[in-house]
């Protein structure tokens, strides 16, 4: 068959357009595994990493991309923080170590399920090591009355994956004032991530495997 120049041009244009008509299937959701590590991003641009340890607790680094800024927490049952080391500065801080918080709860903490509540006493110990010849450790103890509640079951979508989610809130009251927190908890992952602290929101905008 002999093609005219117009026919050849028409076939060429059709061939070039063909790939655009065949759209690739949507990429499959890459569902994260907490034992292998889960990365996330918050509204303020901070990127974090969560990973389940061998003892079942979860270590969450809330800031991994802002220089010397440090916010590392050890969590049990999704939302109960057992320890936290925090230094809110992008530049190195000299003269003392970052404050190291540890908490114990009484009575026994619960699992976060829709409608679950917990109320009890929290004992806090915070230590700071001074950079002197003796490596002096300053220690402060505080007791809090705390209450937790879990509510609002729903589905959320992050980075192309859909997750079952719950909201959780906590209020701590003591001689140092009041602390309030909110998390989004993902039952299928066993992971809770803070989205609000003392009235300041900082939600999760992306999440995926490490």
Located regions from the model:
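Acidic, serine/threonine-rich low-complexity disordered tracts
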Residues: 28-95, 99-102, 125-210
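N-terminal secretory signal peptides and thylakoid transit peptides that target proteins
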Residues: 1-15
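Surface-exposed helix/loop patches within compact recognition domains
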Residues: 108-122
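C-terminal segment of N-terminal export signals and the immediately downstream linker at the start
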Residues: 20-29
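Generic hydrophobic alpha-helical segments
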Residues: 15-16, 167
